[in-house]
Amino acid sequence: MALYFIGLGLYDEKDITLKGLEIARKCDYVFAEFYTSLMAGTNLERIEKLIGKEIRVLSREDVELNFERIVLPLAKDHDVAFLTAGDPLVATTHAELRLRAKKFGVESYVIHAPSIYSAIAITGLHIYKFGKSATISYPEKNWFPTSYYDVIKENLERGLHTLLFLDIKAEKGKYMTANEGMKLLLKVEDMKKEGVFTQETLVVVLARAGSLNPVIRAGYVRDMIREDFGSPPHVLIVPGRLHIVEAEYLVEIAGAPREIIR
């Protein structure tokens, strides 16, 4: 009897690994959460049909506050699957859930799947040159987060690329676009005036990673902010110092201005 954290991958129900599918099918109970990420190419019904099980979707409150009451007691006497988009432990929330399972006396296993951290390699930027990542969050009343701006600054000082996740309000069906992310960054630039993110900043947008036809675009903010990248999910990348191969890839594959090749 155990709890299995199973990754569903990035885009549609076919992204789950064979191992993940096999284990999910043998589990007695299957739970899932979709508030930490969006799988744009599928829906709950299609995932249930593939697995052959009814899936109970948990809210953020269920996961963060009631996991010990809803999920862990079942895993004491049954095999239980907990499905998440992407790779299970990329979201720090899920690592904390595994700790809770251990304290509850429940054995747990992790079945990996495609993650945005590997998928960003399709941009041509070298994975080992990425620094700390950050999330651009929607401002709220009396709260305008700016920490992501500081992360970009720190990474640029070291010549490193910055992967920026874009906020998700799944319960409201609200998914931030790369355009919205750029606008928020420009607002922070107006506030801080440190020259970290301007109209002349080179950015890379990756939309619908994991699909057969993802959008990969690179260019200056002044141009990119007006582009239509299609439906979410999007991620935004601010490159650091570019290797010649990275620059050529961005030009030839992502449509960046040729002048970035130096």
From Swiss-Prot:
Q: Does this entry carry the keyword Signal?
A: no
Asked whether the UniProt record includes Methyltransferase among its keywords, one would answer yes
Q: Where is S-adenosyl-L-methionine bound in this sequence?
A: L10, D87, V90, S115, I116, L166, A209, H234
Keywords annotated in UniProt: Methyltransferase, S-adenosyl-L-methionine, Transferase
- Which Cys-Cys disulfides exist here? none
Q: In which pathway does it act?
A: Protein modification; peptidyl-diphthamide biosynthesis
Q: Return the EC number.
A: 2.1.1.98
Recorded hits in Pfam families, A to Z, give: TP_methylase
GO biological process annotation, one example: protein histidyl modification to diphthamide
Q: Which GO molecular-function terms appear in the entry?
A: diphthine synthase activity
Role summary? S-adenosyl-L-methionine-dependent methyltransferase that catalyzes the trimethylation of the amino group of the modified target histidine residue in translation elongation factor 2 (EF-2), to form an intermediate called diphthine. The three successive methylation reactions represent the second step of diphthamide biosynthesis.
Quaternary organization: Homodimer.
Task: Write down the PANTHER family for this protein, in alphabetical order.
Answer: DIPHTHINE METHYL ESTER SYNTHASE (PTHR10882:SF0), DIPHTHINE SYNTHASE (PTHR10882)
UniProt lists the family membership as follows: Belongs to the diphthine synthase family.
Name the chain's protein.
Diphthine synthase
